[in-house]
Amino acid sequence: MNKRELILSAAALIALCVPPARAQSTTTSTAPATTPATTPDKPETIAQRKDNQQDRIAQGIQSGQLTPGETKNLETKETDLNKEEHTMRSDDDGHLTSADRAKLNNQQNKLSNNIYDDKHNAAQDHFGNSEVGQRQENQQDRIAQGVKSGQLTAGETAKLENQQQGINKEVSGMRQANGGKLTNADKKVVNQQQNKASKNIYNKKHNARTRQ
């Protein structure tokens, strides 16, 4: 056997020993993408709605968007709603009927609009950097904190803001009577009134009544 024949025989032998390649499936199954289940938002409860309204009022007091007069009016409305809710519960063994909830929700919707309107109108507090102005702003900050924390009820807040509204009107009258300025006697009178208001704020924030 010559060299050429030897090479051809070896190649044929190798071909017989090697098995034919099997076709491999390249198709892969893809699981359909799953969408996480979503839970629809639950409507706010009556208590949550009241808390939300008070938080919005507190923010308005803190920022100066709500004047004492506006806050007094809003909190008076909230007090009336709370009284109405209490009466509803008393009439139904501590529970609220579906009709009660619908009525309260409609009234809270109106109050919500009132809060928005008062916070976005032209009436805002700008107390300035004077000693009297800083005292006025400090009182508002303390009231806002009490509203936010629940230490102050809507009724208590209305009374405190009524007092602040009266002081602010008196300060405005004093300034008008003296070319836009306060005399030393004016400052003394205002400071004494704010001392009384400060005690009222403290007492109402630390009594047994809290927002329910």
PLM regions and their residue ranges:
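Sec/Tat signal peptide C-region and signal peptidase I cleavage site
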Residues: 19-23
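Bacterial N-terminal signal peptides that target proteins for export
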Residues: 1-8
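Bacterial N-terminal signal peptides
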Residues: 9-17
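Surface-exposed, polar/charged faces of alpha-helical domains
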Residues: 41-44, 59-102, 106, 110-113, ...
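Eukaryotic intrinsically disordered low-complexity regulatory regions
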Residues: 46, 50-52, 57
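Short, solvent-exposed mixed-charge patches
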Residues: 24-25, 210-212
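A structural motif
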Residues: 49-50, 134-138, 142
